[in-house]
């Protein structure tokens, strides 16, 4: 369902985008070409700031918004989703948020008031709250990354774990 917000803004949807008929796209939303928006997704740009300002929700070319995703912005803040990004089933993107190009956001993950660099992978059931993630950063499933998280130490921990896994699997490689 495509509909106006209370300010009268209608979504601008490229003719080559696909919007499932069960999805709700409301207000100042810009959908670029070759975007897929799946069943029961809700994308609402309808809440203004104290001065009546409302920034758009912009979804970049080739991006895929899967079933049940919710995008909404507090006080009219912007949401920008880059090109060729995938937001998986039932994820929530609550703005203001900026998500780069070629990003993967796993199912049931929550992004709030954050900036996600190009090429990041955020696995399933993760929460990113009030943070800036550098390009190509990896967030494991069920992680919570907030303002008090030292992402340098976090990144080193993930690297150490991955190295241990590689060494362990190389050791048993011939048994597999």
Model feature map: region roles:
Residues 2-12, 40, 44-46, 50-56, ...:
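Glycine-rich hexapeptide-repeat left-handed beta-helix
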Residues 1-40:
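N-terminal segments that cap or nucleate solenoid repeat domains
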């Amino acid at each position: 369902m495509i509909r106006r917000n209370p300010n009268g803004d209608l979504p601008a949807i490229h003719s080559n985008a696909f919007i499932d008929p069960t999805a709700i796209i409301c207000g100042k939303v810009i959908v670029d070409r070759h975007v897929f928006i799946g069943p029961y997704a809700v994308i609402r740009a309808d809440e203004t700031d104290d001065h009546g300002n409302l920034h758009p929700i912009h979804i970049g070319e080739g991006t895929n918004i899967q079933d049940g995703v919710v995008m909404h912005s507090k006080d009219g803040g912007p949401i920008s989703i880059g090109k060729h990004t995938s937001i998986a089933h039932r994820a929530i993107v609550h703005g203001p948020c900026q998500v780069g190009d070629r990003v993967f956001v796993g199912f049931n993950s929550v992004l709030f008031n954050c900036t996600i660099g190009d090429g990041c992978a955020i696995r399933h059931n993760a929460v990113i709250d009030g943070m800036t993630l550098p390009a190509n950063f990896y967030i494991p499933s069920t992680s919570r990354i907030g303002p008090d998280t030292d992402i340098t130490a976090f990144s080193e921990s993930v690297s150490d774990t991955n190295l241990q896994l590689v060494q362990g699997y190389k050791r048993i490689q011939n048994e597999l």
